[in-house]
Amino acid sequence: MAKLDTITLSVLQAALQQVCDEMDLTFSRAAFSPVIAEANDRSDGIYSALDGSLIAQGSQGLPVFVGVMQYSTKTVIEMIADGRCLPPEPGDIYIVNDPYLGGTHLMDVRFAMPVYRGEKIFCWLSNTGHWPDIGGSVPGGFSASATAVEQEGLRLPPVKLFKKGVLDPEIYAIICSNIRVADQRIGDIRAQAAALLIGQDRLNGILDRYGDETVVEAIAELRRRAAEQMRANIAAIPDGTYHSKAFVDSDGVVNEPLTIALAVEKQGDTLTFDFTGSSRPCAGPMNSVLATTLSSVYLAMRHIFPDVPISAGAFEPLIVKRPEGTFLDAKYPRPVSGCAAEVSQRIAEAVFAAMVQALPDKVTAAPAGSSGNFALGGNDPARGRDYVMYQISGGGYGGNSGHDGLTNGCSTIGISKSPPVEIMEQAFPVLYRHYALREGSGGAGKHRGGFGLAYEVEILRGDARASFVMDHGRFGPQGALGGKDGEPNSVTVFRGGVEHVPPHLSKEQDIPLKAGDRVRVGTPGGGGYGDPLERDANLVLRDVALGYYTSEEASEKFGVVLSAGGLTIDRKATDRQRAG
């Protein structure tokens, strides 16, 4: 075999990513549920046949899933090896959602399929899709007051859902007997399997063209280069230990904050992440399983060094000490529905807060840091059927050294977007009375945070139950280097004309609603970066003109005094205000 040349290596790198991209798009375009088809709450990747380590991921999937899936794939491989799982055959697809076996929360359902070359497994393809319901005590699975994982839904160890390409009717029946709106899941299941089959076909085309040995050599070289590049980036960071803290509002059961304490030690070309001092395992659903904790650290560093190609090699210089005895290393039966969408973002926030001290030009202030999980389940009398609606929302990104934060961006753990209002109103008996930018929510700074989202949903028909598992309701996203925090999450429910604010601010379950009742949500703005008094006064004037801040906020937050109805800057008054 000829030595692998640079051009072939580059072509194969792009080809492997393209396989994953096509799997992502197939999954979304064929899926039934809006959360997958419209919001893209899914991901696909290619994983090592030896240990499940990440080979490639698509650019269209949730990055946190791809990092996690290397652990769930590894678990499938290990359970097959020790006889706890039936051995694979061509065409088999395993299903698993057990959080403690390399997962996230129960709603994130993983499929894993071996790709054979002859009689040997060449690699594994795996994907994750967020199912709108997985059973449990409340529609949507976000049980804010759950104290055990069984209350959150059906937990599946790795089992064959497809055998030699055929859906197993018995396993399918067990699943359907334990979830809501089960008749709608077959569309998502078929889409999830189809994505893997497309990936298998495209990967076999690459292997047939270039040869198995060449592709294996390319995979090894890409992993080596990713590790080398990450090490080079780390080596440029000043040696030392950087400390930070981030806070979870509450666990949904005990109304007290949870602390993420982080020390990042940089030595040579490695970073060591130590969460010693973080809160102990909690009673409610804001525990994080180890796979999610690890993936959250990796993803945060991916934000800081986006130039590093993503593969298992990129993670090698990142050493995460296992946070045993804390809520970041959940063990059965701790509930975990808040881990993937909320706690993972607090972990990333802690990483950002530590690393901005070392790399102020590369790291932003804290982003919104909440996926805005809002689940609504009920019966639509006009259609004569039950439904489960799942709404996720964007928020403001943190400001950085050169720019203001992005407004209404997706969460930092992925690329999920809010489903279009028109799709939600068509699919469910709801009306969006208001859907707009949340003015004033961005944290003040030399570069302000981006703004969150404000929306209000009215129930049009029938009875329903609402549940929320969000975060940043008590603490807004942190500012950096003198910047101010962004505005926190806000949830208000109007029942029979009476206003109700959840005691845990961003978490509650099973709130009964009737036609005419409304839910109002305001998502967080991003943290500000740098001293607000150093912000260009002309930018403050522009923000006021656009309606982002009031004239009063311009003076209070930025020290900019406006005159003539907010149309011009009073330079002398501004100088006095900023001088204190």
Q: What does each of the following model-derived ranges do?
A:
Residues I93:
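Glycine-rich phosphate-binding loop of nucleotide-binding enzymes
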